[in-house]
């Protein structure tokens, strides 16, 4: 059975994906990405190769709060790797969505963890009595070094998208809670806006949503009304361009009216969550002979969103900086069978 999979795995720490504003444009260096909600399973990715962006272009990378644990990837690594010079935006993932409200995802990683001097962006250790520690304080320091860099707090993801259905029942209350959290005086200077990663409106991901086609538009409209025109409001969305698929399930054109852009999740179309196959490239740019599922490509997703009325200027193409694989495959060409997931650095497949 085919269903666009939003894995718990994508390595979201910085440059895990990059996006571009047009399908035919250069894929690296023109825009930024998207994600999932539990610890990732792919290896740390290299930063985008391009060092400059076109005028108005965006290079958006994800930094995941859980990366500071087993991956040992910290905000400092964004600076020491040189990635901070190549990015225009960072999506900080994830905040939780529960009880119809935005909520902290991991208080220890977010704002409690004390950093030593050698772990800190600026080489200055945290003190026991300072108001803010953790990733938030490190992001604040990173922004001081890179004043044009924007940080957006992303809520939801694969694991925490089940809370959006309740939020959709009272969009104004949801937006109020998100604003109060993002603009908390302790870290209001860290974030430049909010991103919602709902997987998926009126469709199934880890859980199934039945909020209806208009629910996403209701949430984005409420968020824009509350955050105003000076904050960024974005959303990570499905790339399922199949007939009757996830793009068809919601009013993405209507929701786009309130958003600065969409991070279209044009990756993980195929993978070893289907352990026996069909085997296929996980992130095809275009369709090809023998593709196991029509509509599972970047080209199909962008075309369907444009046909629905989403402006091309509001779509960023997602690129996963990792590979996926199977073991025991029966053929080189796509569409073969397998015996299971290939070994991986953090997770099989």
Regions found by a protein language model. Give the residues of each.
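Loop/turn elements at helix/coil->beta-strand transitions in domains of secreted/extracellular proteins
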Residues: 55-60, 85-91, 145-152, 187-194, ...
């Amino acid at each position: 059975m085919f269903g666009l999979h939003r894995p718990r795995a994508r390595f979201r720490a910085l440059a895990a994906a990059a996006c571009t504003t047009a399908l035919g444009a250069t894929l690296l260096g023109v825009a930024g990405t998207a994600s999932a909600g539990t610890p990732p399973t792919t290896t740390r990715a290299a930063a985008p190769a391009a060092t400059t962006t076109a005028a108005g272009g965006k290079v958006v990378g994800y930094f995941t709060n859980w990366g500071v644990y087993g991956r040992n990837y910290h905000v400092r690594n964004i600076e020491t790797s040189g990635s901070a010079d190549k990015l225009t935006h960072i999506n900080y993932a994830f905040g939780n969505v529960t009880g119809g409200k935005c909520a902290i995802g991991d208080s220890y990683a977010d704002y409690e963890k004390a950093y030593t001097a050698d772990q800190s962006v600026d080489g200055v250790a945290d003190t026991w009595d300072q108001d803010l520690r953790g990733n938030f304080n490190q992001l604040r320091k990173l922004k001081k070094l890179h004043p044009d860099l924007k940080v957006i707090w992303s809520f939801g993801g694969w694991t925490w998208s089940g809370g959006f259905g309740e939020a959709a029942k009272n969009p104004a209350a949801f937006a109020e809670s998100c604003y109060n959290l993002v603009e908390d005086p302790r870290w209001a200077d860290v974030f430049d806006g909010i991103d919602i990663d709902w997987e998926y409106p009126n469709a199934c991901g880890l859980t199934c949503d039945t909020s209806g086609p208009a629910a996403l538009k209701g949430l984005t409209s409420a968020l824009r009304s509350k955050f105003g025109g000076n904050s960024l409001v974005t959303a990570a969305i499905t790339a399922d361009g199949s007939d009757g698929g996830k793009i068809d399930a919601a009013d993405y054109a209507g929701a786009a009216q309130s958003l600065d852009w969409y991070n279209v999740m044009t990756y993980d179309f195929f993978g070893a969550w289907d352990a026996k196959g069909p085997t296929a490239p996980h992130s095809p740019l275009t369709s090809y002979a023998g593709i196991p599922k029509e509509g599972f490509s970047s080209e199909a997703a962008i075309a369907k969103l444009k046909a629905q009325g989403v402006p091309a200027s509001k779509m960023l193409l997602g690129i996963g900086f990792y590979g996926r694989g199977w073991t025991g495959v029966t053929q080189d060409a796509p569409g073969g069978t397998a015996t299971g997931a290939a070994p991986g650095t953090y997770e099989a497949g």
